[in-house]
UniProtKB/Swiss-Prot annotation:
The lineage of its organism: Eukaryota, Viridiplantae, Streptophyta, Embryophyta, Tracheophyta. One of its GO terms (molecular function) is structural constituent of ribosome. It is found in: Plastid, Chloroplast. Pfam families: Ribosomal_S18. The gene is rps18. Residues 1-31, 95-231 are annotated as: Disordered. This is Small ribosomal subunit protein bS18c. InterPro entries: Ribosomal_bS18 (IPR001648), Ribosomal_bS18_sf (IPR036870). HAMAP family: Ribosomal_bS18 (MF_00270). It comes from Jasminum nudiflorum. Transmembrane segments: none annotated.
Length: 231
């Protein structure tokens, strides 16, 4: 019988954690080292009235926090026992310098703000004045152009009126001259016709009178001749 082939299974390696030290070694505390007081209410819980660290049941989560607390308490206790000399003059001098520096900075800041504000106001005022001046000039220019246009319009109107008046006067003069010439021509024609008619009438009357006189004289002469012959 043949052996059944099974898939090769890798052997599981045992999971081993690296050994870690329970507490890290710290450098010895000296004067000037910084103490980290993160939570004062928690510190008060761990310290008794006599200044001793109280034993507490610690869980795995709060272990790290308690370690930091105990180290901070120990540091504070050691530092409080170290011989620090409190120099009041130096402290006061430092405080005075800090206060003067702060006041100087505030004064400089205030001065700077006032100067900037003043500059801004002057710039805005200048801009406003320039804008108003520009607007005024444009308005005056428009007004001048308007007046010029009205003047040219009025002059054009007056010239047109003058031209029309001249044309009217010329036309009226022409018509009056024509009328006068026509009337004079008519009157002269009438006078001529009247005079010619009068002269013709006079001539006709004279000729007729002459002819009648001649006829009468002839007839009278004939009658006288006949009378003389009868006698």
């Amino acid at each position: 019988m043949e052996k059944s082939e099974r898939p090769l299974i890798k052997k599981k390696r045992p999971f081993r954690k690296k050994k870690r030290s329970f507490r890290k070694r710290r450098s010895p505390i000296e004067s000037g080292h910084q103490i980290d007081f993160t939570n004062t209410s928690l510190l008060n819980q761990f310290i008794s009235q006599q200044g001793k660290i109280l034993p507490r049941k610690v869980t795995r989560l709060t272990l790290k926090q308690q370690r930091f607390m105990t180290s901070a308490i120990k540091q504070a206790r050691i530092l409080s026992l170290l011989p620090f000399v409190f120099d009041d003059k130096k402290v006061k001098k430092k405080q005075k310098e800090e206060f003067q520096k702060k006041q100087k900075e505030e004064f400089q800041k205030k001065q700077k703000e006032e100067f900037q504000k003043k500059q801004k106001e002057e710039f805005q005022k200048k801009q406003k004045e320039e804008f108003q001046k520009k607007q005024k000039e444009e308005f005056q220019k428009k007004q001048f152009q308007k007046k010029e246009f009205q003047r040219t319009k009025s002059t054009a109107r007056t010239t047109n009126e003058k031209q029309t008046n001249e044309k009217q006067t010329k036309s009226t003069a022409r018509t009056t001259n024509e009328k006068q010439t026509k009337s004079t021509a008519r009157t002269t024609n009438e006078k001529q016709t009247k005079s010619t008619a009068r002269t013709t009438n006079e001539k006709q009357t004279k000729s007729t009178a002459r002819t009648t006189n001649e006829k009468q004289t002839k007839s009278n002469d004939r009658t006288t001749d006949l009378r003389t012959r009868k006698k």
